[in-house]
Each structure stands twice: as structure tokens, then as C-alpha cells.
Regions:
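Active-site HxH/HxHxD metal-binding segment of metal-dependent hydrolases
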Residues: 1-35, 47-56
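Cap/insert and terminal regions of metallo-dependent hydrolase folds
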Residues: 3-8, 73, 99-196
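Short, charged, low-hydrophobicity "junction" segments
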Residues: 11-29, 84-103, 133-142
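Short low-complexity, flexible loop/linker segments enriched in glycine and/or proline
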Residues: 16, 44, 178-180
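Short secondary-structure boundary micro-motifs
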Residues: 17-20, 61-65, 70-71, 139, ...
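Core dinuclear metal-dependent hydrolase active-site scaffold
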Residues: 30-111, 116-124
Length: 197
């Protein structure tokens, strides 16, 4: 086997098997448990929804699978630390879902040195939906506005020394290239300028 990969323990072992098939040794991390990876390098991973049935939409509570095997969510926040410096990654975690988990992370660490957060959408909406030009433009603007606002909320919550918007660039190519111009996107430089002002 090759390098190690850590991920939040989830009920389905599909993710674990897939990563192992790529040649990695997998370390499954229990929700909100700090795990030593090597020397003084540690990781803590939390399910974005903190296993809240109102957020994960399991209104009747967790089933036997979640209680026995852990979370079934795949969206996670993580903290990587060496005992002195802390990096927080919130990518793919809408703050409306992840606020409780984010607050838990904040309470675990006195100071956040570096914050990573997404600045753009990678979903099928709006480019894969039949919208008129006004609906498309309004949707694009609303999505960009929401992502910028979400990043701002994370910056204000964690108050890091440094931050980096990331994970917002991709290209629709091949047969779907025609949809590229309909994506809700903002250039990284424009997002950074927004956060610096």
C-alpha cells in the first residue's frame, strides 16, 4: 500500500474501499476525535451536520447504522494541527448546515492560523436546468453572492491569521462545453478582492 488517507468514519464503506483501491492505507476518524497521524501531526474531522436530524433530514433520528457505525454524511469539516498551528478546512460545508460543527472546532483551538473555504459552486444548478435568461442571470448572481457571504461568515467565525478561498475552479468540457457559460462562478481573484475589502 502507498500513502495514508484520513477521512471521517461513515456507515457506507464505499469511500473507504474506493480509496484503498487507489493504493492508500485508510485511517477512519470518529466524529470530533483528534487523531495523531504521525509525529506531532493531528487531524480532527467533524460531520458537517453534527448528526443533527433537522439538518440531515432524518427527522426520526439516527437509525441503527448511524448509532453502530457512525455518521452517514460525507460533507465534513476538518482541523489539522501540530500542537501549535491549526489549519481549518470548511470546503463543501454550507455554514447553515455546519455552524454547530464549526463552533465545536473553534472551541477546540485557541487560535486558527489558516482557514480554507470554498468560494464557488460546483453543483449542476443553474447550468443544467431550463431557465430563461433572466432566471439564469438571477440564479448565477444569487449563488455567487451566497458563496461570498458564506466565506465571510467563516472568516468572521474563525478569525484566522490567514485564509484562502479555494476549490472553486473546474471546466465543463466535451459534450457539455455549451453549459460552461451558464455556470454560477466567480474568478478566484475577484473572490479574494471581495474578502480583502
Amino acid at each position: 500500500m502507498g500513502d495514508e488517507h484520513s477521512h471521517h468514519k461513515i456507515h457506507s464503506d464505499f469511500l473507504k474501499r474506493t480509496i484503498e483501491n487507489l493504493g492508500f492505507n485508510v485511517i477512519e476518524v470518529e466524529h470530533d476525535q483528534r487523531v495523531n497521524i504521525k509525529n506531532n501531526l493531528n487531524i480532527r474531522i467533524l460531520a458537517a451536520d453534527n448528526c443533527d436530524p433537522e439538518l440531515c433530514l432524518k427527522y426520526f433520528g439516527c437509525g441503527i447504522a448511524e448509532k453502530t457505525f457512525g455518521s452517514t454524511t460525507i460533507d465534513t469539516l476538518s482541523a489539522i494541527d501540530n500542537g501549535e498551528q491549526v489549519i481549518i478546512n470548511t470546503n463543501d460545508c454550507p455554514i447553515s448546515i455546519a455552524e454547530t460543527s464549526a463552533l465545536k472546532l473553534k472551541n477546540h483551538y485557541k487560535k486558527i492560523n489558516f482557514l480554507l473555504f470554498g468560494y464557488s459552486s460546483a453543483t449542476a444548478y443553474p447550468q443544467c436546468f431550463h431557465l430563461n435568461s433572466d432566471e439564469l442571470q438571477n440564479s448565477q448572481q444569487e449563488i455567487v453572492k451566497n458563496f461570498l457571504s458564506q466565506g465571510e461568515l467563516y472568516i468572521n467565525l474563525f478569525n484566522p491569521n490567514f485564509f484562502m478561498p479555494f476549490a472553486g475552479r473546474y471546466v465543463l468540457g466535451g459534450k457539455k462545453f455549451i453549459l460552461e457559460k451558464h455556470r454560477a462562478e466567480i474568478e478566484l481573484e475577484d473572490a479574494l478582492e471581495y474578502y480583502l475589502n
